[in-house]
């Protein structure tokens, strides 16, 4: 894609995303975010503003207790000191991939999803300048990779699989990019983003 086309593509993506933002959740008090019965988390969907824009993804370290070795966006559970779920996503991104919160231009958020580990996860979409160096925290991240945004947002990349677990039917989505296998919550988040900006 030429630089002109990719510049237009990113502009169109931003316009479509902001025109179709999900309705906000009911207003929650700060304490409600951290109640024992309402486990909340957030991830950052970092869009790197290269001539050909990309999505930044991580592969989680193999020694982690949950979701070891899986492809994921930087993110994690909300802390009591976080002012909002946007703050959660930005803090976690800085901890995991060294993207300073101050450089991220937040476009908005997607509707929250429930994870298999019992968290209510809110994806936050943010633009990151291409000249910002980023790298993985060795304690949490085994590697980083980028997917061209126009490829990530192609709905044909995502294949559904119906599974039955603990008496409940679940539909999960699978996708591949080069040698990276993307599935579960991460694939679902990207697919939701693609659906939101598609015409």
Curated annotation (Swiss-Prot):
Name of encoding gene: nudL
Entry-linked PROSITE patterns: NUDIX, NUDIX_COA
Organism: Yersinia pestis
Record SUPFAM superfamilies: Nudix
Ranges of residues in domain Nudix hydrolase: 38-169
Top-level taxon of the source organism: Bacteria
BP terms from Gene Ontology: nucleoside diphosphate metabolic process
Family: Belongs to the Nudix hydrolase family. PCD1 subfamily.
Name assigned to this protein: Uncharacterized Nudix hydrolase NudL
